[in-house]
């Protein structure tokens, strides 16, 4: 992080998560910004900025691993009524949506951290979400051979996707990136399929 970068917003979901991050030598924005891991989604260039995602394993005190997705962006903004010229980071909007939906009891990914910093007029943002264990993306699910031919299972999974997305839209929140890679499904022998969308803004 540049010396002139100033952290303007930083939120951990709770003290337990803050402690888990500190256990992994991630004290805040600067440490998260400088993490080095292979990209799950290579940085894309849109909105006159960049945005990318990587998976990172956090070590818990009991030796267990809790993977998270670290999403980083630079000058990747969206305009709002309150900020019509410079806009706000799209991750800030996504973080707010996640919190709103969770408070309404709607299952979405868990946002564990949001941070924002400014350097020479350029906005930087980080959003960390807990990886959903036991879930795969809808794209991955359809790529599995055993899922392609069972019409009943396909219908059940698609119904779970509709059931997961419907309450989001009912709250007036439009999902800006509703693709198979952003919808996570959990299925298993005899289990009712469940879907959880990410909330990419």
Residue locations for each model-derived region?
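Glycine-rich, flexible loop segments associated with nucleotide phosphate handling
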Residues: 64-68, 89, 151-155, 192-199
């Amino acid at each position: 992080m540049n010396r002139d970068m100033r952290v303007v917003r930083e939120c951990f979901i709770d003290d337990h998560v803050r402690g888990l991050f500190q256990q992994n030598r991630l004290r805040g924005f600067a440490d998260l910004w400088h993490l080095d891991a292979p990209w799950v989604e290579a940085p894309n260039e849109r909105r006159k900025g960049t945005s990318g995602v990587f998976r990172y394993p956090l070590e818990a005190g009991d030796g267990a691993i809790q993977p998270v997705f670290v999403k980083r962006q630079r000058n990747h903004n969206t305009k709002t009524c309150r900020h019509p010229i410079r806009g706000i980071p799209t991750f800030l909007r996504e973080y707010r949506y996640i919190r709103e939906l969770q408070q309404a009891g709607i299952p979405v990914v868990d946002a564990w951290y949001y941070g924002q910093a400014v350097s020479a007029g350029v906005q930087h943002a980080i959003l960390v979400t807990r990886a959903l264990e036991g879930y795969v993306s809808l794209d991955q699910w359809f790529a599995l051979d055993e899922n392609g031919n069972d019409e009943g299972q396909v219908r059940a999974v698609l119904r779970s996707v509709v059931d997961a997305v419907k309450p989001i839209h009912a709250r007036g929140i439009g999902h800006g990136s509703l693709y198979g890679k952003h919808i996570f499904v959990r299925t298993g022998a005899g289990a009712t399929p469940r879907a959880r969308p990410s909330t990419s803004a």
